[in-house]
């Protein structure tokens, strides 16, 4: 079982190379038209399985379609990856939508709403006291 340093190095290499493949080699207009970024890579300890989390500027419905397209093209992506890096075995890959950004934006929106509501209540209290 590889140590954490090796996992980090291989994950970093995979992220770099897959990003280049998505930008240069993949013939998919949907992916090219939207800014697709790899936010995180989860690599199994035996280096055999890799979950790739992506973010995009597209709305949720389009992001799901992008993930479907990436998972459809994963064999060609994996093949390109095998040509670019030296590994005994290129890991099986699966693409997933990274919803952390959406959740963070939702939390920020809720905080803004609470702040505005609190400010409105303070204004109403001051008007009532006057």
Curated annotation (Swiss-Prot):
Keyword Cytoplasm: yes
Major localisation: cytoplasm
Swiss-Prot/TrEMBL GO biological process terms: maturation of SSU-rRNA
One MF term in the entry's GO annotations: ribosomal small subunit binding
Domain of life: Bacteria
UniProt entry keywords in alphabetical sequence: Cytoplasm, Ribosome biogenesis
Entry keyword annotation includes GTP-binding: no
Subcellular location as annotated: Cytoplasm
A GO-annotated cellular component: cytosol
Family under the similarity heading: Belongs to the RbfA family.
Binding partners and assembly: Monomer. Binds 30S ribosomal subunits, but not 50S ribosomal subunits or 70S ribosomes.
HAMAP family for this protein: RbfA
Role, per record: One of several proteins that assist in the late maturation steps of the functional core of the 30S ribosomal subunit. Associates with free 30S ribosomal subunits (but not with 30S subunits that are part of 70S ribosomes or polysomes). Required for efficient processing of 16S rRNA. May interact with the 5'-terminal helix region of 16S rRNA.
Name listed for the protein in its UniProt record: Ribosome-binding factor A
Species assigned in the record: Prochlorococcus marinus (strain MIT 9301)
């Amino acid at each position: 079982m590889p140590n954490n340093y090796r996992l980090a190095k291989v994950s970093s290499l995979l992220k770099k190379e897959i990003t280049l493949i998505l930008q240069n080699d993949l013939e998919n207009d949907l992916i090219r038209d939207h800014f697709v970024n790899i936010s995180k890579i989860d690599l199994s300890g035996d280096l055999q399985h890799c979950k790739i989390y992506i973010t995009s500027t597209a709305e949720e419905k389009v992001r799901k379609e992008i993930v479907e397209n990436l998972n459809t093209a994963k064999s060609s992506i994996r093949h390109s990856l095998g040509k670019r890096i030296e590994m005994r075995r290129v890991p099986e890959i699966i693409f997933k939508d990274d919803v952390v950004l959406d959740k963070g934006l939702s939390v920020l929106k809720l905080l803004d709403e609470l702040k505005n509501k609190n400010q409105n209540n303070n204004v109403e209290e001051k008007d009532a006291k006057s």
